From Swiss-Prot:
<dbReference type="InterPro" id="IPR016161">
    <property type="entry name" value="Ald_DH/histidinol_DH"/>
</dbReference>
<feature type="binding site">
    <location>
        <position position="178"/>
    </location>
    <ligand>
        <name>NAD(+)</name>
    </ligand>
</feature>
<keyword id="KW-0520">NAD</keyword>
<dbReference type="GO" id="GO:0018478">
    <property type="term" value="F:malonate-semialdehyde dehydrogenase (acetylating) activity"/>
</dbReference>
<comment type="pathway">
    <text>Polyol metabolism; myo-inositol degradation into acetyl-CoA; acetyl-CoA from myo-inositol: step 7/7.</text>
</comment>
<dbReference type="InterPro" id="IPR016160">
    <property type="entry name" value="Ald_DH_CS_CYS"/>
</dbReference>
<dbReference type="InterPro" id="IPR010061">
    <property type="entry name" value="MeMal-semiAld_DH"/>
</dbReference>
<keyword id="KW-0560">Oxidoreductase</keyword>
<comment type="similarity">
    <text>Belongs to the aldehyde dehydrogenase family. IolA subfamily.</text>
</comment>
<dbReference type="GO" id="GO:0019310">
    <property type="term" value="P:inositol catabolic process"/>
</dbReference>
<dbReference type="InterPro" id="IPR023510">
    <property type="entry name" value="MSDH_GmP_bac"/>
</dbReference>
<dbReference type="GO" id="GO:0004491">
    <property type="term" value="F:methylmalonate-semialdehyde dehydrogenase (acylating, NAD) activity"/>
</dbReference>
<dbReference type="InterPro" id="IPR016162">
    <property type="entry name" value="Ald_DH_N"/>
</dbReference>
<dbReference type="GO" id="GO:0006210">
    <property type="term" value="P:thymine catabolic process"/>
</dbReference>
<dbReference type="Pfam" id="PF00171">
    <property type="entry name" value="Aldedh"/>
</dbReference>
<feature type="active site" description="Nucleophile">
    <location>
        <position position="286"/>
    </location>
</feature>
<feature type="binding site">
    <location>
        <position position="386"/>
    </location>
    <ligand>
        <name>NAD(+)</name>
    </ligand>
</feature>
């Protein structure tokens, strides 16, 4: 339930809500108003150790629960998430700031991830080949790996945790979850509903906090694997530190997603697609379009329509259904984004839509409106860096080949999109672009949960992505059995 009461957030360890053993807390404001809605503990190492101990003890019995029985628990959890989806969306808007429309979409994508987890028995099946030699059979079996941990960001406080712990738990593991200290309330509700579904205590544990919790997870000898989503520098740190301590790690990192606009595109749908990708969720998502490479032949027409439509977007509290762009997560992030806008102007880019000029009626929240730059080049910071905001850079290119070359010069390679009605253009793009997830006339090429989610280059550290068969392989260990009976 959403109330006006300022909440003191707790950890959930071994089936119980408990106060952190530490004394340090951090205020959690509503990004749309700046008013404090909660205090979250910055838990110390001792809290992580207790959570791991609980998960380790629970693993001894949970890993032996028949696979169909584990799925039945997840079906109950899925039902509870569906029954409470309106409340969950409102919590997201309250603490994250994204519009209620965007939050509702996130809830649905999270539910779809749990739907995938319920099918884990099928995805976990091994392989067998009889009579590989005289009287000898061979087979591959998949087993859970033990205690695993997830470290998740503020921008998708429901979807990303649900990529992780339901599938890991369906595979027979137990879990320690550390969500962003900026969005702790949704995590609490996810855990409450999880235990309402009848899971045994200790199967899922929640430890709130900051970098001390992260370091404790990475260094704890009883945690076998770590899933992470966040910025590129932190992802690199998590991967290097976790693997140094002998852990299996998947670390999904930053992005600078490009869209190539061809002269043969459907102009109206392309403009609306770019707007949705660049400015929905205030641009705070790793699959947002942040650069458009538009072919010269259509550039002026495309830009004119894009600017006109963007100027219609309203900025404000996400609970107001008229608003399209909500606040950024924190005042510090807003100041960082304003710095990038100033940098773009100083570097000589043309500011076509200035998100700094927004209606004063938006109040005291952390607002930056949709922003568009033209005349951007690869030497500018606004092209190079992940800004994580509703800031779009336009680069004019002569043809598809130049657009592909531009895109591939980025150090990131998460997602990329082409807008075209030409199958040959789409095929050339697909085969030559360096990105983990590719869209053809698809605004945000984030795959459904039954496909793997992972980028390339500085957008991903590890071997196996989240979701789909990648996720099952990450959360399980293979045993190859060769057997003969006399």
């Amino acid at each position: 339930m959403i109330t006006t009461e300022i909440k003191r957030v707790k950890n959930h360890i071994n089936g119980e809500w408990v106060e952190s053993t530490g004394t340090e807390v951090e205020a959690v404001p509503n990004p749309a108003t700046g008013k404090i809605i909660a205090y979250v503990p910055l838990s110390p190492k001792e809290d992580v150790e207790k959570a791991v101990e609980a998960a380790k003890a629970a693993f001894e019995t949970w890993s032996k629960v028949p696979v169909p029985n584990r799925s039945r628990n997840l079906y109950k959890y899925l039902q509870l998430l569906q029954e409470n989806k309106d409340e969950l969306a409102k919590i997201i808007t309250l603490e994250n700031g994204k519009t209620l429309t965007d939050a509702t979409g996130e809830v649905q994508r999270g539910i779809e991830a749990v739907e995938l987890a319920t099918s884990a028995p099928n995805l976990m099946m091994g392989q067998a080949l009889p009579n590989i030699a005289s009287g000898i059979d061979g087979s591959i079996w998949r087993y859970p790996i033990g205690v695993v941990a997830g470290i998740t960001p503020f921008n998708f406080p429901m979807m990303i945790p649900l990529w992780m712990f339901p599938l890991a738990i369906a595979c027979g593991n137990t879990f320690v979850l550390k969500t962003s200290e900026r969005t702790p309330l949704l995590a609490e509700r996810l855990v409450e509903l999880f235990y309402e579904a009848g899971f045994p205590k200790g199967v899922l544990n929640l430890v709130q906090g900051g970098k001390d919790v992260v370091n404790s997870i990475l260094e704890n000898k009883d945690i076998q694997a770590v899933s992470f989503v966040g910025s590129e520098p932190v992802a690199r740190y998590v991967y290097e530190t976790g693997t140094k301590h002998g852990k299996r790690v998947q670390a999904l990192a930053g992005a600078k997603n490009h869209a190539i606009v061809m002269p043969d595109c459907n102009l109206e749908k392309t403009v609306q697609g770019v707007i949705g990708s660049a400015f929905a969720s205030s641009g705070e998502r790793c699959m947002a379009c942040s650069v458009v490479a538009v072919v010269d032949e259509i550039a002026d027409e495309f830009i004119d329509v894009l600017v006109a439509e963007t100027k219609k977007l309203k900025v404000g509290d996400g609970f107001n259904e008229d608003n399209y762009v909500g606040p950024l997560i924190r005042e510090s992030h807003k100041e960082r984004v304003l710095g990038y806008i100033s940098s773009g102007v100083a570097d000589g880019a043309t500011l076509l839509v200035d998100g700094r000029k927004i209606n004063e009626e938006v109040g005291e929240g952390y607002f930056v409106g949709a922003t568009i730059f033209d005349g951007v080049n690869q030497e500018m910071k606004i092209w190079q860096d992940e800004i994580f905001a509703p800031v779009l850079s336009i680069v004019r290119v002569k043809d598809l080949e130049e657009g592909i070359k531009l895109t591939n010069q980025s150090k990131f390679a998460n997602g990329a999109v082409i807008y075209t009605s030409n199958g040959k253009h789409a095929q050339t793009f697909r085969d030559n672009i360096d990105a983990g997830m590719i869209g053809v006339n698809v605004n945000v090429p984030a795959p459904m949960a039954f496909f793997a989610f992972a980028g390339n280059k500085a957008s991903f550290f590890g071997d196996l992505g989240t979701n789909g068969t990648d996720g099952v392989q990450f959360y399980t260990r293979k045993k190859v059995v060769t057997e003969r009976w006399f």
